[in-house]
Amino acid sequence: MKILVVNCGSSSVKYQFIDMKGEKVLCKGLAERVGIEGSRLVHKVNEDKHVIEKPMKDHEEALKLILETLLDREIGVIRDLSEISAVGHRVVHGAERFASSILIDEEVMKVLEENIHLAPLHNPPNIMGIKAVQKLLPQVPNVGVFDTAFHQSMPRKAFLYPLPYEFYEKYRIRRYGFHGTSHRYVSKRAAEILGRDYYDFKVITCHLGNGASIAAIRHGKSIDTSMGFTPLEGLVMGTRSGDIDPAIVIYMQQNLSIPVEEVYNILNKKSGVLGLSKLSSDMRDIEDAAESGNEMAQLALEIYIYRIAKYIGAYTAAMNGVDAIVFTAGVGENSPYVREKVCDYLGFLGVKIDRNLNNMKGVERIVSTPDSRVAILIVPTNEELVIARDTKQIVESGIKELKLF
């Protein structure tokens, strides 16, 4: 079975084509600047990269070009579209309706469109991608895998906000959490690496990219996570503020006369590491500047690391202990400095890291010492593989929903 995994952003389509026999990635790529001048497709087969510059006015044209490229005699990997057994879609927000990966039909599409208001930036392009595939490959089943689904196991004490209860009853304002597919993959993989039973295992997973979140996973279920009603809550991120006093928003509007749209833009695109450092949202730039003596970069790093450590401490308490802590995503996988400084806060847990192992790059590994009471791991995330696995299981089994917990 060969599965096409699709992740549609507002002006991009990211894809992987995976042969599930051996779970081999046959090709992958990115259609970028979709609907914008200068659109192009970057297509990779093994180590070979091919760039196709071609106008793509919308997601349908982008997906059509991707399918044409898969069929290309020179750089393609299939001879006929019938070789595509199914398409798995990343969908950012499944609301409370979807706590599972699901076979997409008319009813599912209706629910997705009804919940656009919960993810107005992310769900519309996800929906456009699904509709385009349904048109281009009408006989091929489509499966939706939701970023929020894994966190639907959270108890009410974790997902409810202390607002008047009617805000939840009427408007479903609550913590949803995101990056669920990543947290699910790396937590399971950590249990495998350590030879532990996933369903008798307490793990804290740190997905640290430009967007960042932490999850507390006990016995295979997410019991809490740092992102909330939107991906703005929680950790200090590349350009997002994370946790702040909500009254600051009111102050910015009333006392500083900043329009609500600009407040939203400031909190999402001008804050975080970028706002604190006045320099960059890229942690590599921040670390280089901090090492060169830039005090604002040093401060941004300190605040970023401190917030991560605070959440780890809180989630250790929430689970009454922790067996392992996992670092993943761009910063989590590639910044020895961030990992080391976070772990420096965790001596009270008996955390000890091997600095030589920690300083290695790009390899899945345990970086804690043998006598560390908590295992520290680096696990590169693989959300596309999770989507492909769920898609395969649903299509092969003939089921509509794949329960995650």
From Swiss-Prot:
InterPro entries: Ac/propionate_kinase, Aliphatic_acid_kin_short-chain, Aliphatic_acid_kinase_CS, ATPase_NBD
Binding site for ATP: 14, 207-211, 282-284, 330-334
Catalytic activity: acetate + ATP = acetyl phosphate + ADP
Functional pathway: Metabolic intermediate biosynthesis; acetyl-CoA biosynthesis; acetyl-CoA from acetate: step 1/2
UniProt cross-references to CDD domains, sorted A to Z: ASKHA_NBD_AcK_PK
Pfam families assigned: Acetate_kinase
Sequence positions that bind Mg(2+): 7, 383
Family membership noted in the UniProt record: Belongs to the acetokinase family.
Identification of the protein by name: Acetate kinase
Species per Swiss-Prot/TrEMBL record: Pseudothermotoga lettingae (strain ATCC BAA-301 / DSM 14385 / NBRC 107922 / TMO)
Name of the encoding gene: ackA
